[in-house]
């Protein structure tokens, strides 16, 4: 660096042919790293000490080292690079030829010329006017190298380059046209002497080069004229509106500024290692390398954005504004890539762009998938919630189908909103999965809803039938089955009609087969429930109780429900026989469920589909088999006999009369006692209260139970008093025995006395 503080110039190749790897920093410092194609490269060639650096400093405002006038020695060593002042032009100052420092070593001269023409758009050939026409002095040997190199590198692409000859110390004695003709003659002679590739044997120099000529007066002797000529030439370099603007579009090497450092390094390494220089291949390699670098650069902030976005995704939740976020992330990374990589080889740029899109696709697809999976769960939940609010007057299937289409469209809309340019994310698998699950859930819900409705109907049916059975068995009669069957069949038919109306709401309207299946199942279940309820109401204990109630109502009460009062034993015997016969007949009626004509009811279902134990209607409708009928009849008759004996005893007690003379004697002999009782209010009140209680018990028929309770209570009191007395007496006997023992000293006798007393007490 000639000026390290602002990096105005840098040596890219030193005198030892080593390339400077700090060139990217230089490009950054001069503000050209992001210039893209908006920059130009100019190189100067010429003999040593001919004022090349001075020309560049005056022309472009650079600060290359210049020769000390008092010392005729080499100042520019290697290849230096600087940026033109206020213009995006990279100026390359190349070590001069014919220097005594290198002598006969022409290797660097050839390599620097090859490097210059490979990287520059314009080659400034600096020469003195008095050197024109001379082979060595006019740099014809160097120009031959330039022409050979250009033909070698660009014959396939026919890229053009400008050779801008600057004639120094131009006096004007010989016109510029004549000087130009002389130089062109020499160039044509050199071109004709070159060995040309096949197909270019007849080519001329103007097929590959544009040649320009400019004369500059003496810098010291004609300083003002020199400055004016330099200013005029500078305008041609910096003003693109100038009619003689030097930088033609065809001159540009199409190397983006951010790849210039890498490109020049690879070019120099190839030249230095004496390899065949294939610039198109080098440009492709550069494009591939730079595109990879750019992808790495743009993927760093993209990966960071992905990490941030991932934190916004709570498990199973939707991410708000995800389509906008994904699109912004996608466009940001692609635009950043396009902004830098689009300047390179189009084929490589497009190929790498597709790789970048694929990488971005794989990263963003995770969010696409997570969003649709979260939406899937949300839509499934919303379907279940909505199913509870479906209109009651619309078939569930129809409402379900409408809702499924609505939710599937939401999934499709969300998937399409997440789509990105040049990226195809297939939402169909997510739609198919959602549709299948919703359809499956719909069918499940249909079955559950229908099951709930049918269970609700069956529960109402069970309640109605249970109530009818319980009421019927509370008051048994010989036509109990007719009554029960009428109520059962009425409830069954009503429920069947409801089933016919409900089932089409949850299955296809035309699916009559399913409706029939539900009706048949209901009939089976209804008959089984009816039979089960009958069995529970006709258990051994309940049946005995109800038969006893039925018997007592016939035996104890008349047709008006009033208790019977028997005065003759013959009457009670007749009533007993009639009541017993009717009750035993009722047992036979209850044994089988039959209608009044003696036939079994019509099941309207296949008996074999009910339960394995039922093989025929007779087996289903038979509640009590012959053995159970016999057992129940025997047990009941025993109970009936007890009731009869109790009633018979009460009749006998009632009919046994006290002699009339007894009442006369009672009045005569007990007159004084009667009067004493009547005169004593306390005793009279006790007698009145006792008489009222006894009369009430008699009227209600509870006199006998009350008598039994009183006798039992009296016996308990007597037993309790006896135990207390016995215990007290035993204690006294033991005490007396102990006292006797102390006096007589004979415990055996005392024990015998105690035992004797105890025996006597018992």
Curated annotation (Swiss-Prot):
Record keyword DNA repair present: no
Residues annotated as binding GTP: 46-53
Organism (species): Schizosaccharomyces pombe (strain 972 / ATCC 24843) (Fission yeast)
Pfam families, alphabetized: RHD3_GTPase, Sey1_3HB
Topology in membrane: Multi-pass membrane protein
Protein family according to the UniProt entry: Belongs to the TRAFAC class dynamin-like GTPase superfamily. GB1/RHD3 GTPase family. RHD3 subfamily.
InterPro entries: G_GB1_RHD3_dom, P-loop_NTPase, RHD3/Sey1, Sey1/RHD3-like_3HB
Name of the molecule in the record: Protein sey1
Gene giving rise to this polypeptide: sey1
Function: Cooperates with the reticulon proteins and tubule-shaping DP1 family proteins to generate and maintain the structure of the tubular endoplasmic reticulum network. Has GTPase activity, which is required for its function in ER organization.
């Amino acid at each position: 660096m000639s000026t390290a503080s602002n990096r105005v110039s840098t040596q890219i190749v030193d005198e030892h042919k080593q390339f400077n790897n700090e060139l990217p920093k230089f490009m950054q410092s001069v503000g050209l790293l992001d210039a893209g194609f908006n920059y130009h490269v100019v190189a100067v060639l010429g003999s040593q000490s001919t004022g090349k650096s001075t020309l560049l400093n005056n022309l472009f405002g650079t600060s290359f080292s210049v020769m000390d006038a008092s010392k005729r020695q080499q100042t520019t060593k290697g290849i230096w690079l600087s940026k033109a002042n206020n213009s995006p032009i990279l100026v390359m100052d190349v070590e001069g030829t014919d220097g005594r420092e290198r002598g006969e070593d022409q290797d660097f001269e050839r390599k620097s010329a090859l490097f210059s023409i490979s990287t520059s758009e314009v080659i400034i050939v600096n020469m003195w006017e008095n050197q024109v026409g001379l082979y060595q002095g006019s740099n014809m040997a160097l120009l031959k190298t330039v022409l050979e190199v250009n033909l070698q590198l660009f014959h396939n692409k026919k890229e053009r380059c400008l050779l801008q000859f600057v004639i120094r110390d131009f006096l004007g004695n010989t016109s510029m046209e004549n000087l130009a003709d002389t130089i062109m003659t020499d160039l044509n002679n050199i071109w004709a002497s070159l060995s040309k590739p096949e197909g270019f044997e007849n080519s001329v120099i103007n097929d590959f080069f544009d040649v320009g000529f400019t004369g500059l007066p003496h810098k010291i002797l004609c300083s003002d004229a020199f400055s004016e000529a330099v200013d005029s030439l500078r305008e041609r370099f910096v003003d693109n509106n100038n009619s003689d603007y030097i930088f033609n579009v065809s001159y540009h090497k199409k190397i983006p500024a951010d790849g210039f450092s890498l490109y020049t390094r690879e070019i120099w390494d190839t030249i230095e290692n004496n390899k065949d220089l294939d610039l198109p291949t080098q440009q492709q390699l550069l494009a591939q390398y730079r595109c990879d670098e750019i992808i790495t650069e743009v993927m760093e902030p993209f990966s960071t954005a992905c990490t941030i976005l991932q934190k916004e995704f709570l498990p199973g939740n939707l991410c708000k504004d995800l389509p906008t976020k994904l699109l912004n992330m996608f466009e940001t990374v692609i635009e950043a890539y396009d902004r830098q990589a689009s300047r390179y080889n189009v084929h490589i740029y497009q190929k790498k762009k597709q790789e970048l899109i694929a990488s971005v696709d794989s990263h963003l697809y995770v969010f696409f998938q997570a969003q649709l999976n979260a939406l899937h769960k949300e839509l499934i939940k919303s379907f279940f919630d909505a199913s509870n609010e479906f209109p009651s007057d619309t078939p569930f299937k129809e409402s379900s189908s409408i809702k499924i289409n609505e939710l599937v469209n939401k999934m499709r809309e969300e998937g399409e909103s997440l789509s990105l340019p040049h990226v195809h994310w297939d939402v169909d698998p997510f739609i198919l999965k959602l549709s299948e699950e919703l359809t499956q859930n719909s069918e499940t819900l249909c079955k559950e809803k229908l099951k709930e409705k049918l269970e609700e109907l069956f529960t109402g049916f069970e309640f109605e039938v249970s109530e009818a059975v319980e009421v019927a068995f509370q008051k048994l009669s010989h036509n109990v089955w007719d009554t029960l069957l009428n109520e059962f069949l009425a409830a069954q038919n009503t429920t069947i009609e409801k089933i016919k109306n409900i089932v089409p709401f949850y299955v296809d309207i035309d699916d009559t087969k399913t409706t029939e299946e539900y009706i048949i199942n209901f009939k089976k279940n209804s008959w089984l429930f009816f039979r089960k309820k009958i069995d529970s109401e006709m258990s051994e204990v309940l049946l005995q109780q109800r038969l006893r109630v039925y018997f007592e109502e016939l035996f104890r009460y008349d047709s008006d429900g009033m208790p019977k009062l028997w005065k003759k034993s013959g009457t009670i015997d007749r009533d007993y026989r009639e009541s017993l016969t009717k009750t035993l007949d009722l047992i036979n009626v209850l044994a089988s469920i039959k209608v009044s004509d003696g036939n079994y009811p019509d099941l309207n279902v296949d008996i074999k589909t009910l339960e394995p134990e039922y093989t025929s209607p007779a087996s289903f409708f038979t509640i009590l088999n012959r053995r159970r009928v016999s057992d129940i009849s025997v047990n009941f008759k025993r109970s009936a006999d007890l009731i009869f004996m109790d009633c018979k005893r009460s009749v006998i007690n009632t009919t046994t009369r006290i002699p009339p003379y007894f009442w006369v004697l009672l009045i005569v002999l007990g007159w004084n006692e009667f009067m004493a009782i009547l005169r004593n209010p306390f005793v009279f009140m006790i007698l009145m209260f006792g008489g009222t209680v006894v009369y009430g018990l008699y009227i209600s028929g509870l006199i006998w139970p009350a008598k039994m309770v009183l006798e039992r209570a009296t016996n308990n009191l007597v037993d309790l008093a006896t135990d207390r007395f016995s215990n007290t007496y035993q204690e006294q006997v033991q005490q007396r025995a102990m006292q006797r023992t102390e006096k007589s000293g004979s415990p055996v006798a005392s024990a015998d006395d105690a035992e004797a007393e105890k025996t006597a007490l018992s």
